[in-house]
Amino acid sequence: MRHPDDMPYLRHILDAIARVEEYTRGVDQEAFERTPLVQDGVIRQIMVIGEAVKLLSEELRDKYPSIPWRDVARMRDTLIHRYFGINV
């Protein structure tokens, strides 16, 4: 059973994934690398996902151990704190 407080965060994650898909539809690697607007949009949504993951209950995260929750959260931290070292 899902923790009722998890639902808003799960919605944020799904919305962010949908936005990344929308922003990158028809965009190949080369176009992504030369389009800062798309990069910024994708990076922002990855940060949203990472923050939402941090707020999910331990119960939910434990229920799905195959999902690398900590890696997702760390990606958010990397994007926030080491922004100038990011290589897209």
Label every model-predicted segment.
Residues M1-V88:
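Solvent-exposed interaction patches of small proteins and small membrane subunits
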